[in-house]
Amino acid sequence: GTGTRMESRLPKQFLRIRHEIILMKTMRTFHEFDKSMDLLIGLPAGEMSTWKRLCKDENFQIPHRLTEGGETRFHTIKNALQYISSPSVVAVHDGVRPLVDQQTIQRAFEKAEATGNAIPVTDIHESVRIVTASENKAVPRKYYKLVQTPQVFKSDILLDAYEQEYNPDFTDDASVVEKSGVFIH
């Protein structure tokens, strides 16, 4: 992300929460979950030198590899997948979501190991409406969930899904995998 909606000149992943850079806090959460986990970070090419400088300035020691981000999330993930060894289990997470808890990560990995994939979801508490040119009506929110990250997949499923051409309807990795014909858990 670039921080455009936040009207920040600094990309949001480089902002601080409680004196810690957001992306570093996010990475620390995953590193604490599993210190042997390979961490791949997709960043726009123009931000890589900033990241390297921040890591040096902050004495950030968590091992990770950088991959070049793409035009969209789809392209960023597709670029990163070239570094995935198969078979493995892959978690895709938004670097600006540092408050994910260990239990959510654990459940997602366990479910993906058992079923091939897992996405965390939460209930919607707000009212939901469908609005089109011909209708504007309330819909039962019990049928809808908010999708979060990390989204976790067995590597063969994710690698196969990303062989597809880009579709602007892809909003996350689950939508890419689902479009390839795989049921999402």
Kindly give the residue locations of the regions a language model identified.
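Short phosphate-binding loop-to-helix
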Residues: 56-89
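N-terminal glycine-rich phosphate-binding loop and ensuing alpha1 helix
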Residues: 1-49
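A structural signal for isolated positions on well-ordered beta-strands in alpha/beta enzyme cores
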Residues: 38-40, 65, 185
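Short beta-strand-to-loop acidic/aromatic patch adjacent to the donor-nucleotide binding site
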Residues: 87-97
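Residue-level signal for inorganic ion chemistry
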Residues: 14, 23, 80, 93-94, ...
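Conserved core of the sugar-phosphate nucleotidyltransferase
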Residues: 99-185
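Hydrophobic/aromatic residues located in beta-strands of well-ordered beta-sheets
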Residues: 39-41, 90, 117-118
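Glycine-rich phosphate-binding loop at the start of an alpha helix
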Residues: 24, 74-78, 102, 171
